[in-house]
């Protein structure tokens, strides 16, 4: 879906009119947050966000995978597989398309074992059988089915939470206060102060707050140096993708926004390719978008023309984050003895 513009502006007539529906939605969401979940056979670390749309969960998950591997853990990611047709539980492999398992699981499976499961408890059980010493739950913060031993929330420092109203009047998935109360660590990504009060609330409740930034992979930058590009994206926050390109010196001659998880058609990609060719531009998109395009054999010729812009997450105080993860896993394992 494409986010309504009024979510990230002052409180508007649209949000006021939707407030009664939002109140009902929020009451149900708050009740779900309070429910006890089923405990998995190994520690579960949830990477989530407070709101609908993108916040950087996927690169955060992949960085946590690297951190955990460095201390001898065997992480396996469990994902609902949003946008895919398979209910699972199933381990993502090279034969799966993004249409089967979702674009994010397909992309992450290049780096880490990924289990797609509508039932997150069953997903965690399969992850354990696949050798997981710790489960990384991709999203699912507001879903009560699986108990979380640690909740790591990501938030954009500049964008924050918009009008801070509950869906559909605003972007929040549930009332903010109970979400903050259940946050064990907050990763504030980028520059800005829109999340400062939330960070303060997490600290006051004994949680960890660290700052981080997206850093482009050198291989991506090398392919774009000196080029004028046509950038396109169908993610939660396309503006952040475009801003990251510009920040690192990439000349954006044209930019195209699509809805999050948009299923690109051959006609759309042909139009993009034709515009790029006419203007002498390089086509560039996100890894997640390219995962959807590559999964469709009819789009293979277009996929070969597109440069994926890959980013990693750089955490400022990674030592504090590592200590946090160790402590939460140690506590979780002691509770299971």
From Swiss-Prot:
Reactions performed catalytically: a lipid A disaccharide + ATP = a lipid IVA + ADP + H(+)
GO biological process per UniProt: lipid A biosynthetic process; lipopolysaccharide core region biosynthetic process
Keyword field contains Kinase: yes
SUPFAM superfamilies for this protein: P-loop containing nucleoside triphosphate hydrolases (SSF52540)
Ligand binding (ATP): 51-58
EC number: 2.7.1.130
InterPro entries given in the database record: LpxK, P-loop_NTPase
Annotated keywords: ATP-binding, Kinase, Lipid A biosynthesis, Lipid biosynthesis, Lipid metabolism, Nucleotide-binding, Transferase
GO CC field: plasma membrane
GO MF, one example: tetraacyldisaccharide 4'-kinase activity
Taxonomic superkingdom: Bacteria
Disulfide bonds: none
This protein's pathway: Glycolipid biosynthesis; lipid IV(A) biosynthesis; lipid IV(A) from (3R)-3-hydroxytetradecanoyl-[acyl-carrier-protein] and UDP-N-acetyl-alpha-D-glucosamine: step 6/6
Family listed: Belongs to the LpxK family.
Function according to Swiss-Prot or TrEMBL: Transfers the gamma-phosphate of ATP to the 4'-position of a tetraacyldisaccharide 1-phosphate intermediate (termed DS-1-P) to form tetraacyldisaccharide 1,4'-bis-phosphate (lipid IVA).
Entry protein name: Tetraacyldisaccharide 4'-kinase
Lineage summary: Bacteria, Pseudomonadati, Pseudomonadota, Alphaproteobacteria, Hyphomicrobiales
């Amino acid at each position: 879906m494409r986010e309504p513009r009024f979510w990230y502006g002052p409180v508007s007539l649209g949000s006021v009119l939707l407030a009664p529906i939002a109140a009902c939605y929020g009451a149900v969401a708050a009740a779900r947050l309070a429910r006890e979940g089923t405990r998995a056979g190994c520690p579960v670390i949830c990477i989530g966000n407070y709101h609908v749309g993108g916040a950087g969960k996927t690169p955060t998950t992949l960085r946590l995978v690297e951190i955990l591997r460095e201390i001898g853990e065997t992480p396996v990611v469990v994902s609902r597989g949003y946008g895919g047709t398979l209910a699972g539980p199933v381990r993502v492999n090279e034969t799966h398309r993004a249409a089967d398992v979702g674009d994010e699981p397909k992309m992450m499976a290049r780096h880490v074992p990924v289990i797609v499961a509508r039932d997150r408890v069953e997903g965690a059980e399969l992850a354990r059988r696949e050798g997981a010493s710790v489960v990384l739950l991709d999203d699912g913060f507001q879903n009560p089915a699986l108990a979380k031993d640690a909740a790591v929330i990501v938030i954009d420092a500049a964008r924050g939470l918009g009008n801070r109203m509950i869906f559909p009047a605003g972007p929040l998935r549930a009332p903010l206060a109970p979400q903050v109360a259940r946050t064990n660590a907050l990763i504030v990504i980028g520059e800005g102060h829109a999340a400062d009060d939330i960070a303060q609330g997490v600290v006051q409740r004994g949680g960890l707050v660290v700052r981080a930034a997206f850093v482009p992979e050198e291989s991506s930058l090398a392919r774009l140096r000196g080029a004028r590009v046509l950038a396109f994206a169908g993610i939660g926050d396309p503006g952040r993708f475009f801003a990251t390109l510009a920040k690192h010196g990439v000349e954006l001659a044209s930019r195209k926004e699509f809805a999050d998880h948009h299923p690109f058609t051959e006609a759309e990609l042909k139009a993009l390719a034709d515009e790029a060719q006419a203007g002498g531009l390089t086509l560039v998109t996100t890894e997640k978008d390219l995962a959807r395009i590559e999964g469709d054999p009819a789009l293979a010729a277009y996929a070969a023309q597109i440069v994926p812009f890959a980013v990693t997450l750089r955490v400022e105080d990674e030592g504090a984050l590592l200590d946090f993860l160790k402590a939460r896993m140690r506590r979780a394992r002691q509770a299971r003895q």
